[in-house]
Amino acid sequence: LICVKEKFLFSETTETCPDGQNVCFNQAHLIYPGKYKRTRGCAATCPKLQNRDVIFCCSTDKCNL
């Protein structure tokens, strides 16, 4: 499985997930209205929601754009 680690305007950085991590995630944490900090990568399971977070999980290559 290949997940996006960072996304830029015209490019992206990817990572190959190790054995046992078969989920890609895209987590957006609200810093203040209109401003989010995004975290992307591989995980064994979908991360738990925390206060003011939005999380998207998927299991195909580069699905966490």
From Swiss-Prot:
Q: Which domain of life is it from?
A: Eukaryota
Q: Which GO terms describe its cellular component?
A: extracellular region
Location in the cell: Secreted
Record's keyword annotation contains Iron: no
Q: Name one GO molecular function term.
A: toxin activity
Q: Which cysteines are joined by disulfide bonds?
A: C3-C24, C17-C42, C46-C57, C58-C63
- What keywords would UniProt list here? Disulfide bond, G-protein coupled acetylcholine receptor impairing toxin, G-protein coupled receptor impairing toxin, Neurotoxin, Postsynaptic neurotoxin, Secreted, Toxin
Against InterPro entries, the record matches this protein to:
Snake_3FTx, Snake_toxin-like_sf, Snake_toxin_con_site, Toxin_cobra-type
Q: In which tissues is it expressed?
A: Expressed by the venom gland.
Free-text function comment from the UniProt entry: Binds weakly to the muscarinic acetylcholine receptor (CHRM). Does not show inhibition on GABA(A) receptors.
How is the quaternary structure described?
Monomer.
What protein does this entry describe? Muscarinic toxin-like protein Tx-NM3-2
Organism, scientific name: Naja melanoleuca (Forest cobra)
Q: According to the entry, what is the taxonomic lineage of the organism?
A: Eukaryota, Metazoa, Chordata, Craniata, Vertebrata
